[in-house]
Amino acid sequence: LNSITRLHRFSALVRSHIRDPRRLDAVTEIVGLDLFCPNDLYFFKPPGTGRPIAWHQDSWYFRNIYVSSVGDAIDQSTIGTWLALDDADEANGCLWVIPGSHRLGVIDHSQVESDDYLLQKRVTVSDEMEERAMPVEVPKGALVFFNNALLHRSTPNRSDRFRRAYIVHYMKATIQHTGNRPRFPEGTEHWGTPEMYICGQQLPGCVQTTLEKDSMDWDRALERTLTEDDIRISEP
């Protein structure tokens, strides 16, 4: 088991963590006062295993699903947070980044020609960029903030320790759905990814985080919106 996505849909504890004022103090300063959460993700990466993740940008994935209603680039409308649940270092497969790569904007991704990687899309980087890459070694409890256009990856866990992490993405409320990749059955009101309201305004014509009401009621949420793609479990 490598990861579980969208825990916020079914856990009040997770939702309270995502809305923790200590997080939002920083996020609202960087992104803005009106926010929703498009996705959260829990990585296990157990000792001696855990598939690597190739160089990629989260904004590339978001660009296929969302568009700004006010003309902002998608990489200027989102931010990622990465919470270390264990000490993270090179040995147990910490996060790697290429400093300054977010200034390149969103780069096209290509298919990974290997089943060894957790994600099947990647950015091919130059030797010069590879040389600038640096590990993000942080202690348990550290919270890393990064632009969603920042090129990042992680390596396998070659240690005898876990390297667990919890990732939350925040997005401006000025975002609209592109109409791509519907994730809910026909006949329901919910399209796009299962977003969560965070703070501020919900703007007309933009993403409306109606799932907040459903997610408080486990049975209703399961009956109306749960599909196999909602909680995706990746086998090692």
Where are these regions (language model features)?
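Generic beta-strand structural signal
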Residues: 33-35, 39-40, 51-53, 77-83, ...
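Secondary-structure boundary elements
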Residues: 24, 28-36, 73-75, 85-91
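Double-stranded beta-helix
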Residues: 75-78, 88-153
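Non-heme Fe(II)-dependent double-stranded beta-helix
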Residues: 1-55, 60-66, 110, 181, ...
